[in-house]
C-alpha cells in the first residue's frame, strides 16, 4: 500500500481470511497511531501466500506457526532480500488439527505435489492395471481412484477413471501426464479433492 494509506484509517466490509487472529475490519486507535509512527512500509498478504508459508515452515523448519503468526514470513517472500539479513517474528501455534490438515493439503495442491486427472478407458480387463503401471513407471503415487462406469450411455464404450496422485512438483506432474498421454489415455487435469 502507498504511504497515503497511513494517514486515513480504512474500514473494510469484511475481514475474511485464514489469518483469523489478525482479521479486523478496522484497526484500533492506539495500534493505528503506533503503526503510523513506526512502520515504514505495509504489504498485503493473500491467503494462498500464507498456505505456502505454512507448508514451508512445517516441511523445512519442522515448526507449526498459526496463520496470523506467518504474516511476516509470507510478506518477506515478496521482498528482494537476497544477500541481506532479515528477521521474521513468528508467533502462535494455536491451530487445530483439522485446520492444519486442510492447509497442508491446499499447499500440496498449490505446488502440484497432489493433483487429479480424469481418463476415459475402454471397459475391458487390464485397463486399470495399465494406468496404474504407467503412473508407477513415471514415479507417481496413486492416492485415490474413482471408477465411474456410468459416464457414457454405452458403458461398454468407455468408463471414466479419476485419479488423485502425488508428484514432486509441476515438472514431475507434467511428466506423469505425458506418460499417460503416450499410452493413449488422453488425461485431463481436474481439480484435486482429497475428501
Predicted segment positions?
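Glycine-rich phosphate/pyrophosphate-binding loop at beta-loop-alpha junctions
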Residues: 1, 8-37, 77-122, 132
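Short Gly/charged-rich anion-binding patches and loops
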Residues: 2, 30, 53, 130, ...
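Alpha-helix capping/termination and helix-coil
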Residues: 26, 58-61, 80, 94, ...
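Active-site-adjacent helical/loop segments in soluble small-molecule enzymes
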Residues: 28-84
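A conserved regulatory-domain signal marking ACT and ACT-like small-molecule sensing domains
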Residues: 97-195
Amino acid at each position: 500500500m502507498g504511504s497515503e494509506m497511513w494517514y486515513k484509517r480504512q474500514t473494510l466490509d469484511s475481514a475474511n481470511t485464514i489469518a483469523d487472529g489478525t482479521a479486523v475490519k478496522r484497526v484500533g486507535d492506539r495500534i493505528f497511531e503506533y503503526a503510523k509512527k513506526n512502520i515504514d512500509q505495509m504489504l498485503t498478504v493473500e491467503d494462498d501466500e500464507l498456505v505456502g508459508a505454512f507448508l514451508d515452515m512445517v516441511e523445512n523448519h519442522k515448526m507449526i506457526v498459526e496463520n496470523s503468526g506467518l504474516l511476516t514470513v509470507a510478506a518477506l517472500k515478496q521482498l528482494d532480500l537476497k544477500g541481506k539479513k532479515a528477521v521474521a517474528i513468528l508467533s502462535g501455534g494455536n491451530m487445530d488439527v483439522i485446520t492444519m490438515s486442510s492447509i497442508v493439503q491446499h499447499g500440496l495442491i498449490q505446488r502440484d505435489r497432489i493433483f487429479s486427472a480424469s481418463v476415459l478407458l475402454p471397459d475391458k480387463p487390464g485397463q486399470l492395471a495399465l494406468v496404474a503401471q504407467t503412473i508407477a513407471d513415471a514415479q507417481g503415487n496413486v492416492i485415490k481412484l474413482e471408477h465411474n462406469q456410468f459416464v457414457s450411455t454405452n458403458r461398454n464404450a468407455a468408463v471414466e477413471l479419476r485419479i488423485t496422485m502425488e508428484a514432486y512438483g509441476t515438472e514431475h506432474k507434467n511428466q506423469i501426464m505425458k506418460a499417460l498421454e503416450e499410452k493413449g489415455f488422453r488425461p485431463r487435469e481436474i481439480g484435486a479433492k482429497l475428501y
